[in-house]
């Protein structure tokens, strides 16, 4: 957690990628943190590897990964298969499970 605070202090912009083209831009950018807002269980591992191979911290938005059930097992899948650094979700159970897996978490909520 301290590493991400240090990285954001130096480079406070976070890249959010929603397609393969934006992944290419993000890995070449100065952003140290990338939020992955797309993918499926078939390709999320490759997407995360590409981001991590560029030396970036990668969060996966679990709610937006096609084919991923929004249950506690989603956190374990994200930690083991794509080996992401963190999870974003609107679901409290997914966030709790991700923390228990040792992942950084962002609990996304909407205010009206």
Please place each PLM-identified region on the residue numbering.
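Conserved N-terminal beta1-alpha1 strand-loop-helix module at the mouth
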Residues: 1-60, 66-68, 83
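Conserved anion-binding
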Residues: 50-81, 86-112
